[in-house]
Structure formats: C-alpha cells, structure tokens
C-alpha cells in the first residue's frame, strides 16, 4: 500500500485465511524495518534524535493498540489489533502489527474506505466528534498509566523531542518563549490522551456521511485536547476559513466533548473548569505548533495570517 516515513518499513494489505474454515479476512500489516531505514528526509531532518524519536514512536503505537485501543468505542473508532510482537521491546530490528482493515465492513457496522484531501463542514465536524469522544475516553488519565508506555507528552512536535528544529529557528520572541509556551501546555490541569498527529489524512470516512475512524497512533500521549483540535483545523482550513470558523468549531467541539464526558459513569469532571482552561490554551497549542514549523519548515503554508495573529497574541500575553 505505502512505505513508512523515511523508509522505516511499509504498510500492506493482506488476506488472512483461517485453517478451521474457508473464511478469509483482509487485514493491514504494518512492518517496521528499523535497521533498513535511511531514506533522505525531504527537509534534511535525518539526525540521531530523529531516528530515536521514530523508533520510539512505533513502540508507542504498538503499546497503544495493545493496551489502550479497547477503550475507544464506536464514537472514536480505531482498528482492532489482530496480532503483534508484544512481548519484546522495540529495538534496532524488525517487528510488525496486524490490524483490522478499517476499509471493510465488520460486525460493528460499515467500513471506512474513503480518504479526504478536503472536507465539508459536516465532515470536519465528524472529525471533531471523533476527537471529542477520544479525549473524553481518556480524560484525567493517570500519568503512571501512560508515561512508561506512551509519550509522557503527546504530539510529534513536542519541544522536548524537537530541539534540533528549535536550534535553527531565527532568533526572536517566539524562540525565546518556546519553553514557556511548552510548559504552559504541560501544566494543564485537565489532561487526557491526545492523538498527536490528528491531521485530515489520518481520518477514515465512510462511503455515506457518518462517524469516522482514525489511524496512526505513533505520537499518542498525555496533554491538552486543544493540541489535536488546533492541528486538525490547521490541516483542513485556509487562513480566511480559520478566522471565520474558529469560534463555531470550538463551540461544536466543546458541546460534543461535554456530551461524551457526561456519558461516562466512572468519573466526575468539573466540565466548566475544563472548558475554561482548554479554551484559554487553544491559542497556546496553535503557537506551539507554529514554533515547530518555524524551525522545521520556515514559510510553510500553515504559517499564514491567522497563525501569525494567534502567535503574536500569545507572545504579548507572556510579556505582561
């Protein structure tokens, strides 16, 4: 089907045949070849820190599917883990996961065979609904349950894993404030699991409008849900669309999140306090990603006027 980023393996669709019957089932095999990696990164980021981060990311994904994915219901659908090398730590070698093929219908309903390069308002709301239900499923998760097996701080652009990119940033207020912005997000009282790479390309859509599924959990870890929301919006909307739709999209997300949190019987959350904190952190999450882009790919199309305005506002707040 496709190669993994920078030559770290491949993803293939296979047919599983069962010995006890004539039944077969399609599945997705994600094969990681750490020793064979080494394709040139399109922007030159191929150093030791990058390699270590990628190796860890595949181990994290394996751990997520093995130990956390079962907590994701139909409202935040993920693939079922069918098999994997789960008992030895990821190392400089080969390993694989066998996952449910989300394209195919199952006993849980229709499949998700469609991928999008652009979305309607309804489709974007479906992605926000997935995020809201995912965040609700793991809200207030304890650090000890996460930190040794997933990322202690989720997202692929987390500052502690991106010092190489920070180092090449142009000197200025954003570079100086990077650690403060990062710490503001890390100090969030209401923590959940964030997907960590919640771009449009990682959502799978049904043939007819409805719920969506998500893939690619290499950077899942603890954090503020606004990291996922800001990143999703940045992957879908233009400068003008971000400005025009920000408030309505945030309102929709928080309505969906409140309903999902209230549906849980095992926790008590002061949702008003959560919403107040996370709304305040939305712009910090956006500025944090902008910081990453400023080092990784200066001039990236996502560094538009809306991003500039939000980041400037954050920097001004920090100067007070």
Model segments located where?
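Regulatory N- and C-terminal appendages and interdomain linkers associated
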Residues: 1-5, 17-26, 93, 268, ...
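Conserved ATP-binding subdomain of kinase catalytic cores across diverse folds
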Residues: 7-12, 17, 21-153, 225
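ATP-dependent phospho-/nucleotidyl transfer catalytic cores
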Residues: 107-195, 204-207, 302, 316
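Short amphipathic beta-strand and strand-loop transition segments with alternating hydrophobic
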Residues: 1-3, 82-86, 179-183
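Active-site activation/catalytic loop segments of kinase-like enzymes and analogous catalytic loops
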Residues: 50, 63, 219-264, 285-304
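Active-site acidic catalytic loop and adjacent metal/ATP-binding pocket
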Residues: 10-18, 28, 180-227
């Amino acid at each position: 089907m496709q190669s993994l980023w920078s030559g770290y393996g491949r993803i293939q669709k296979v047919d599983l045949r069962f010995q006890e019957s004539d039944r077969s089932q399609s599945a997705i095999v994600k094969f990681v070849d750490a020793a064979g990696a080494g394709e040139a990164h399109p922007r030159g980021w191929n150093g030791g820190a990058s390699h270590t981060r990628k190796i860890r990311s595949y181990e994290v994904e394996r751990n997520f599917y093995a130990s956390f994915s079962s907590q994701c219901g139909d409202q935040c659908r993920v693939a079922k883990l069918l098999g994997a090398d789960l008992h030895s730590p990821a190392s400089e070698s080969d390993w694989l996961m066998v996952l449910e093929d989300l394209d195919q219908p199952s006993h849980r309903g229709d499949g998700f065979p469609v991928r999008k390069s652009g979305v309607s308002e309804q489709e974007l709301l479906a992605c926000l609904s997935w995020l809201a239900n995912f965040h609700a499923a793991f809200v207030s998760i304890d650090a000890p349950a996460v930190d040794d097996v997933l990322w202690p701080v989720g997202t692929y652009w987390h500052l502690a894993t991106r010092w190489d990119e920070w180092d090449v940033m142009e000197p200025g207020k954003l570079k100086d404030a990077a650690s403060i912005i990062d710490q503001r997000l890390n100090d969030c009282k209401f923590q959940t699991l964030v997907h960590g790479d919640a771009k449009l390309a990682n959502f799978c859509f049904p043939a007819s409008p409805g719920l969506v599924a998500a893939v690619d959990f290499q950077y899942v870890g603890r954090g503020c849900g606004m990291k996922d929301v800001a990143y999703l919006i940045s992957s879908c909307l233009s400068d003008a669309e971000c400005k025009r739709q920000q408030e309505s999209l945030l309102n929709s997300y928080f309505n969906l999140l409140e309903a999902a949190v209230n549906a849980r019987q095992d926790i008590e959350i002061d949702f008003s306090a959560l919403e107040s904190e996370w709304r305040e952190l939305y712009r910090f999450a956006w500025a944090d990603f902008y910081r990453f882009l400023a080092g990784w790919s200066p001039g990236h199309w996502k560094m538009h006027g809306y991003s500039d305005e939000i980041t400037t506002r954050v920097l001004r707040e920090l100067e007070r």
